[in-house]
From Swiss-Prot:
One of its GO terms (molecular function) is glucose-1-phosphate adenylyltransferase activity. Pathway: Glycan biosynthesis; glycogen biosynthesis. Transmembrane segments: none annotated. Involved in the biosynthesis of ADP-glucose, a building block required for the elongation reactions to produce glycogen. Catalyzes the reaction between ATP and alpha-D-glucose 1-phosphate (G1P) to produce pyrophosphate and ADP-Glc. This is Glucose-1-phosphate adenylyltransferase. It catalyses: alpha-D-glucose 1-phosphate + ATP + H(+) = ADP-alpha-D-glucose + diphosphate. Its EC number is 2.7.7.27. Belongs to the bacterial/plant glucose-1-phosphate adenylyltransferase family. Alpha-D-glucose 1-phosphate binds at residues 107, 172, 187-188, 205. GO terms for biological process: glycogen biosynthetic process. The lineage of its organism: Bacteria, Pseudomonadati, Pseudomonadota, Betaproteobacteria, Burkholderiales. The gene is glgC.
Length: 423
């Protein structure tokens, strides 16, 4: 484990993972599950990255706050994250919306979700609360972040990263002075403020916050009494704390876990089909910026029992082969060609087909003589023999969902609708 993972501030910290969001920008990928439960990287779920960061940082007291279509997420956590031991005060508590405050209230926002569980948090007597978005992909040593929070001496610390100005309107945009005080915070502004020394960049919140526990509890109480509040960290709580001059910034570079010092810091909000596709395809690089093979900082998950991947046939024009790709257990590449793609568990590709720059989720089946390029195929899809996807934008748009950057999303429901229309 990395240095600093077991310092006392970490042992006095409870981590809260906000995992209740629908993630509607991912279109039909979140039709049946919350965004943190979406598959990623060949064998993982998105939430595995933030939970692995917690465990690898020595944070073993974790609450996961869920709401939207949480069944698959809860099942994944029960199967893959039950190894922490309650008898030594380690746990992952599942905290679905239970109308704890009044019978009419589900979680009305991210801040309200934490507020409704204050009584549970107080039982553990934490000194610090680490609040984490459960839908981002990155590797971070939270112990370093918490130690920085303690050293800075402010009651609230917000982790931040630089992004291109053109992308900043999707995030909370921050202005920070030379001493790292946050002087301004705008949630998803239409016209984001650029960095003073880098006019093409903006400094944005990563959705990662550290609070002194008693301070957070008081701030949440004040927020809940404000009838005009959305009860959201980004929209309400953080701007209010910034306005009082009580929030500090923590640059991601200070705690990013990298394979080598010269590697760039990698953090992705995979909240759109384009971003989701791109982050998966990033992993096919010879040396990807996000290293899944780092034994010092493993990404933990639940992996169902499956046989090894298999590649069969070696005939001219019918050769089972994958190049610059991730191929998971249980896959069968039968006389098909795969280039720069990610195949999740149990994918089956039949003869004479080709798959390029595509992401195929578990148990997808691609028939003979198919051609796929820049496609995301949802779990359990069966692509009929001879189908071509990703080569004709107009034809693709009539049948499936085509993103702004030309990624084609294919789901079981779309294929069924197409079958019915052609019957």
């Amino acid at each position: 484990m990395k240095d600093g993972a077991h310092h006392r501030p970490v042992r006095r910290t409870i981590s809260l993972v906000l995992a209740g969001g629908r993630g509607s920008r991912l279109q039909d990928l979140t039709e049946n599950c919350a965004k943190p439960a979406v598959h990623f990287g060949g064998k993982f779920r998105i939430i595995d990255f933030v939970l692995s960061n917690c465990v690898n940082s020595g944070l073993h007291r974790i609450g996961v706050l869920t709401q939207y279509k949480s069944h698959s997420l809860l099942r994944h956590l029960q199967h893959g994250w039950s190894f922490l031991r309650n008898e030594v005060n380690e746990f992952i508590d599942l905290l679905p919306a239970q109308q704890r405050v009044d019978e009419a209230s589900w979680y009305r926002g991210t801040a309200d979700a934490v507020y409704q569980n204050i009584d549970i948090l107080r039982e553990h007597d934490p000194k610090y609360i680490l609040v984490l978005a459960g839908d981002h992909v990155y590797k971070m040593n939270y112990a370093s972040l918490i130690e920085d929070h303690v050293a800075l001496g402010a009651p609230c610390t917000v982790a931040c990263i630089e992004v291109p100005l053109a992308e900043a309107s999707a995030f909370g945009v921050m202005t920070v002075d030379a001493m790292r005080h946050i002087t301004r915070f705008d949630e998803k502004p239409a016209h984001p403020q650029p960095m003073l020394d880098q006019p093409e960049q903006a400094l944005v919140s990563m959705g990662v916050y550290v609070f002194d526990a008693d301070y957070l509890f008081a701030a949440l109480q004040t927020d809940i009494e404000d009838a005009a509040s959305h009860h959201d960290f980004g929209k309400d709580l953080i701007p209010a704390i910034v306005s009082r001059g009580e929030a500090m910034a923590h640059p991601f570079d200070l705690s990013c876990v990298k394979s080598s010092p010269e590697s760039p810091s990698y953090w992705r909000d995979v909240g759109t089909v384009d971003a989701y596709w791109a982050a998966n395809i990033d992993l096919t690089a010879t040396i990807p910026q996000l290293d899944l093979y780092d034994k010092d900082w493993p990404i933990w998950t639940y992996q169902p029992t499956s046989p090894p991947a298999k590649f069969v046939f070696d005939d001219e024009g019918r050769r089972g082969m994958a190049v610059d790709s991730l191929v998971s257990g249980g896959c069968i590449v039968s006389g098909a060609l795969v280039r720069r793609s990610v195949l999740f568990t149990g994918v089956h590709l039949h003869s004479y087909s080709s798959v390029e720059e595509s992401v195929l989720l578990p148990e997808a089946d691609v028939g003979r003589h198919c051609r796929l390029r820049k496609v995301v195929v949802d779990e359990g899809c069966r692509i009929p023999a001879g189908m071509t996807i990703g080569f004709d934008a107009e034809d693709d748009a009539r049948r499936f969902h085509v993103s702004a950057d030309g990624v084609v999303l294919v789901t079981v429901a779309m294929l069924e609708a197409l079958r019915v229309s052609q019957a």
